[in-house]
């Protein structure tokens, strides 16, 4: 899976991020984006890129960083989840421009975010994928 770059967005779970990075470092290139300027993330070596931001750039940071790397796919992971490598392979095998484990539907009829329907780990058509674990083809962002 060397054509996928893992981008982990850290804010308050550095121990979990460390576990994710160490699990994946032999499977694919890894980048950690630390959005917590009060708690710099240590450099781990082993080819793991660590970016310590001077301020919290919120969720948009994950998408901006996609443009800095050459791999044709980016696996975006939040700091509170640890995807199993077999899940990533299953997502990749779908060969879709974007696939995730969490999405929402019902935008057309909802009056608020709370009225949207959640879809976790199910094969469903959604209006949008919400963070968590997302595999995206870079060409879908270009």
Feature names for model-found ranges:
Residues 54-55, 77-81:
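Short acidic donor-binding/metal-coordinating loop in glycosyltransferase active sites
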Residues 3-5, 29:
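Cell-envelope/extracellular polymer assembly enzymes that use nucleotide-activated donors
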């Amino acid at each position: 899976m060397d054509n996928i770059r893992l981008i982990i967005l850290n804010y308050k779970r550095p121990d979990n991020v460390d576990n994710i990075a160490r699990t994946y470092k032999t499977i694919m290139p890894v980048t950690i984006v630390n959005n917590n300027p009060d708690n710099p993330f240590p450099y781990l070596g082993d080819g793991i890129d660590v970016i310590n931001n001077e301020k919290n750039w919120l969720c948009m940071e994950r998408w901006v960083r996609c443009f800095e790397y050459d791999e044709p796919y980016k696996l975006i992971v939040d700091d509170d989840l640890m995807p199993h490598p077999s899940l990533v392979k299953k997502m990749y095998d779908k060969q879709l421009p974007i696939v995730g484990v969490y999405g929402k539907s019902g935008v057309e009829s909802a009056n608020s975010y709370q009225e949207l329907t959640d879809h976790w780990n199910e094969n469903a058509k959604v209006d949008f994928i919400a963070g968590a674990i997302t595999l995206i083809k870079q060409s879908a962002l270009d």
